[in-house]
A protein has these predicted regions:
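Core subunits and conserved enzymes of cellular information-processing
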Residues: 1-149
Length: 149
């Protein structure tokens, strides 16, 4: 029963998670070039690539991502669950870092990052970490589960 509770807390993002993982940081290109700005779709593609690669928990600039998380443009800003985030965008994913890195390299998300770099001057770095800590967010996605009409 406790294992099931822990799995559910991980899935809804309301518990802290610690473990090995991978970090991808994106930085907007030149401010005077509209096409050189990271947009919501870029973040969604990368997050989906990380889930596809075996991530167990993901965050963007400290905001936990779950299946119910909204990542949207709001004018010139990007919001994660209606909270503004800005460049540089730090996407952290906890999971088997070596397996995840190899799997991510073969996803469309990896190709998309290369496209952004080569065609839109958006810079990115990837790092493997032996320990990452993603904070739980009881006020975020998990809380939405209780607000059904």
């Amino acid at each position: 029963m406790l294992d099931r509770l822990n799995a559910l807390q991980l899935a809804v993002g309301d518990t802290n998670v610690r473990g090995p993982g991978m970090t991808i940081s994106l930085t907007d290109g030149p401010a005077d070039d509209e096409d050189a700005q990271v947009v919501d779709e870029d973040l969604r593609i990368i997050v989906n690539g990380l889930w596809q690669s075996g991530a167990e928990a993901v965050s963007i600039n400290g905001h936990r991502i779950t299946a119910r998380t909204a990542i949207h443009d709001a004018g010139s800003a990007i919001t994660v669950d209606y909270r503004s985030v800005s460049s540089p965008y730090t996407i952290e994913a906890i999971g088997d870092s070596h397996a995840m890195t190899g799997a991510f390299a073969s996803t469309p998300a990896s190709s998309w990052l290369a496209y952004l770099r080569d065609n839109h001057q958006i810079r990115y770095t990837t790092n493997i970490s032996s320990t990452l800590q993603l904070e739980g967010d009881p006020e975020g996605s998990a809380d939405q589960l209780q607000r059904r009409p």
